[in-house]
Structures are given as C-alpha cells and as structure tokens.
Amino acid sequence: MKHKSGFVSIIGYPNAGKSTLVNALVGEKLSIVNAKVQTTRDRILGIYNSENYQIVFSDTPGIIDPKYKLQKKMMSYVMSSFVDSDLVVYVFDSSTNKNIVGKIKDILLELKVPLLIVINKIDLINQQKVEDIMKSLKSDFLDSYLSLIHI
C-alpha cells in the first residue's frame, strides 16, 4: 500500500483555539496553550502518523495587523504556511465574531488551497448566533471552502 502525506496549516486570530486543536489532533501537548495573546510566535509543526498516511500540522501565530518588526515576522510565518499547504484550517472564534481580514482571505482565494472552516467555542453562544455565523462565513468564502464545522 502506498504511504500518503499532507501538510495542513491551522490559522485564525489569537486565542481562537489553534494550538489546542493541533494538540488534540497530534495527541500530545506540542503547542503552548495560554490566555496570553501571541504565545505562538513561530510555526510549530506537529505530525500525526498512521500506518497508511502522515499529516504534518502547522500551528501558526494568531493573525494580527502587524505594528512592529516581530509582529511582521510572525505574520510572514502565517503567509508562508499557505504556500506549503495541501489544506488550510481556519479556526474561527465564535465568541469574538472577528472574521479574517481581506488580505489573507484574498491570498487563500488566489492560491486555491482547500479551506476547512472550524467554528470554535460554540458553547459560549446561542444556537441562533451559530447559524448566523455559518451563514456569514458561507457568504464570505462562497465556493472556496471544503467544509464548515463547529466544535
């Protein structure tokens, strides 16, 4: 049987749950999880191995509008992760309702990388708000996403 592998970038705003998701997917505490913003400053790679496949997850810094050199470097890690990806997972924090900025959305659409949208923290909002968010995200990304799930 042929062994398959793929690269998955996890993106989203700070504290959206990206590192928690990566830790859960690889089955160990690889990325630091902290309430402090910008705990993840570099790309952190986590690998999930199976008998027939391997998935390399890239936990990226939270998406921000960079104000100084370190933040610009952190955003370059996010941008470079798109190029290497077979799939981008966008973790959307439903408790803040902040959607990704136009520049990043435009890059995703331009690269035509498949997009999986994960709506996180739905336990903090009501069902109507979940439905409104799903409708808004579907409208924003039209045909560019593979699937939209909530956790």
Question: What function would you assign to each model-found segment?
Answer:
Residues 84-102, 116-128:
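Conserved Switch II/interswitch segment of TRAFAC-class P-loop GTPases
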Residues 1-67, 72:
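Conserved G1/Walker A P-loop phosphate-binding module
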Residues 38-43, 61-84, 94-107:
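Switch II of P-loop NTPase G domains
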